[in-house]
């Protein structure tokens, strides 16, 4: 078992990140390059390998 995802992200680093709204864990979507907060209904983009954890950059994933 490896500690990196298919894109080379450190799993431990991704596990340490939490939703800035709910403080819930995030799910990594490799295809969309986003960190998903199911609890808040938001998707935070990853650009150039850097998670953008700003609310004004997040995409709403449910109404």
Swiss-Prot record:
Question: What name has this protein been given in UniProt?
Answer: UPF0434 protein Pden_2369
| InterPro entries cross-referenced by the UniProt entry | Trm112-like
For this record, an example GO cellular component is:
cytosol
HAMAP family assigned: UPF0434 (MF_01187)
Provide the family line: Belongs to the UPF0434 family.
Per the database entry, which stretches of residues form a coiled coil? none
Which organism encodes this protein? Answer: Paracoccus denitrificans (strain Pd 1222)
Q: The organism sits in which domain of life?
A: Bacteria
Checking Pfam families in the record gives: Trm112p
């Amino acid at each position: 078992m490896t500690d990196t995802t298919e894109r080379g992200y450190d799993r431990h680093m991704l596990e340490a990140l939490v939703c800035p709204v709910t403080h819930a864990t995030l799910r990594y979507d490799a295809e969309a390059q986003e960190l998903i907060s199911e609890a808040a209904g938001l998707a935070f983009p990853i650009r150039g390998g850097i998670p953008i954890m700003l609310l004004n950059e997040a995409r709403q994933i449910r109404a």
